[in-house]
Amino acid sequence: NRVNPDDLPFFYALLKHLHDAGCKVPQFITDRDGQWLQTVAGRPACLIEFLDGVSVTEPTAVQAYSTGAALGHMHKALANFTLARPNSLGVSAWRPLALRCTADGLESIAAGLSERVFAECDYLEAHWPSNLPVAAIHADLFPDNVLMLGDHVGGLIDFYFACTEIRAYDLAVTHSAWCFSNDGTVFDTDVSAGLLAGYTDIMPLDAATQAALPILLRGACLRFLLTRCYDWINTPANALVTRKDPLAFLRRLDFYSGPSEVENLFRHRA
């Protein structure tokens, strides 16, 4: 339901490009005539290849290293990918999304949350980098979108938030998703070091990107905080869908907002 049918050719081309470059991603399955897009019950439909592996809930530093390297290889492969898709959940979308949540809705989740969210929107809009490399990114590489075979990555899946964005923002999203306990209360320095080492062994970060990383990390947290807030406010309590705790990403945001925390990320690298 969340996929715009007009975006399907972008996703198809993206996955084919990555597959042809040797990245472990699923492929669209074609019919005898070579067509990958069908119509079922009046709606667009396609079949996606199955990949072996399991998603981990408590990743190890070694698994994080493998994931960082896989993300780096994906970014390297996408350097010459020419199609583009706007990021509908980028920095320009966060304030409108916060307004749709309403101040009362945000306050129903936690006292003071509305003021915190809009202050963060102000800060990020004023400081969002404009001089970093832009490319196609995954934008949602949580542990449940990485299939592990032991300590090795068996596949990267669920590219339906893929878009054109600052490349390092993808690393920020992945870091915020992988390096904390599920509730955001515990930061794992070993997993962080592994993830960053795996990525930078493939895609080294220049000084400008390292300097911008604190902003990108905060942006990643605000994005998921807001989408979780919106779902929390607008999903009935008796719905079959399980709502995800927005405050897990507020805690991450608070962590990354610490003045020395991001410098420590690189200090703790293996």
Regions found by a protein language model. Give the residues of each.
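ATP-binding pocket architecture of kinase catalytic cores
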Residues: 1-83
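ATP/Mg2+ or Mg2+-diphosphate-binding catalytic cores
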Residues: 100, 224-270
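A cross-family kinase active-site recognition segment
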Residues: 58-112, 134, 240-241
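All-alpha amphipathic helical-bundle segments outside canonical DNA-binding/catalytic cores
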Residues: 207-217
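Structured catalytic core of nucleotide-sugar glycosyltransferases
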Residues: 15-16, 21, 25-38, 42, ...
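Active-site activation/catalytic loop segments of kinase-like enzymes and analogous catalytic loops
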Residues: 168-204, 219-236
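Active-site acidic catalytic loop and adjacent metal/ATP-binding pocket
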Residues: 28-30, 122-169
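Anionic ligand-binding catalytic core segments
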Residues: 152, 167, 181-186, 248, ...
